[in-house]
Design a protein with these regions (language model features):
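Vicinal oxygen chelate
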Residues: 6, 17-20, 71-73, 81-83, ...
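Short, well-ordered beta-strand micro-motif
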Residues: 55-57, 68, 127
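Short, extreme N-terminal leader segments that mark the start of a protein/domain
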Residues: 1-16
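Histidine-centered active-site/metal-ligand motif
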Residues: 9-10, 48, 53, 64, ...
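A short, acidic/glycine-rich surface segment
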Residues: 40-44, 71-77
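Short glycine-/small-residue motifs
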Residues: 63-66, 136
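Core segments of cupin and vicinal oxygen chelate
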Residues: 14-63
Length: 184
């Protein structure tokens, strides 16, 4: 068995321009640029493919990294996956922080979707300059709701696996608070 994973070390995505990406994440997201690797040869494969690999501190020991690959074809999206599926979500402290973040992003000229209610958290969505969808989320759920969802998770996955239709066991998740039925 694999030893216990301690945490995610970093998450890496491709970018169009490393300098522009670092500047955007520092200015817009308040992240700190910490490290850069640049090589002409990929250490793991030995391939000749020059790259710049930049790392940003997201806070809480979390690291976001990007690769600029100037010799590769222009980056694109997976044409078979909707844009809303692949995204990176960051947590903010509370709803006030979420609303402040939305105002900040809009002041930067960034289109923001939301806040969207997800039962146990609220989110806003937007894109970085590379086309990566980002989410800022704040937790609003109760301990009882998290316990209920944990108990339902195996049942829901099994039902989905059999039917490929959304199970209704936790449909309260996307109803606004005044419409949410009491917990069982």
């Amino acid at each position: 068995m694999i030893p216990a994973i301690q945490r995610i070390h970093h998450v890496a995505y491709r970018c169009r321009d490393a300098k522009e990406t670092v500047a955007w994440y520092e200015r817009v997201m308040g992240m700190r640029y910490t490290t850069a690797f640049a090589e002409d040869t990929v250490p793991s494969t030995g391939e000749h493919d020059p790259y710049m690999h930049v790392f940003l501190d997201c806070g809480g020991g979390n690291v976001l990294a990007f690769f600029e690959l100037p010799n590769q074809p222009e980056m694109g999206r997976d044409p078979n996956t909707p844009a809303w599926v692949q995204h990176l979500a960051f947590e903010v402290a509370d709803e006030a922080a979420l609303h402040a973040a939305k105002a900040h992003l809009e002041a930067e000229g960034i289109d923001v979707l939301g806040p969207t209610y997800h039962g146990i958290f609220r989110s806003i969505y937007f894109f970085d300059p590379n086309g990566h969808r980002l989410e800022l989320a704040c937790n609003i759920g109760t301990a009882a709701q998290r316990v209920e969802l944990a108990a339902l998770a195996p049942v829901m996955l099994e039902e989905w696996s059999r039917t490929k239709r959304a199970p209704r066991h936790a449909e309260w998740l996307h109803k606004e608070p005044e419409a949410v039925a009491p917990l069982r």
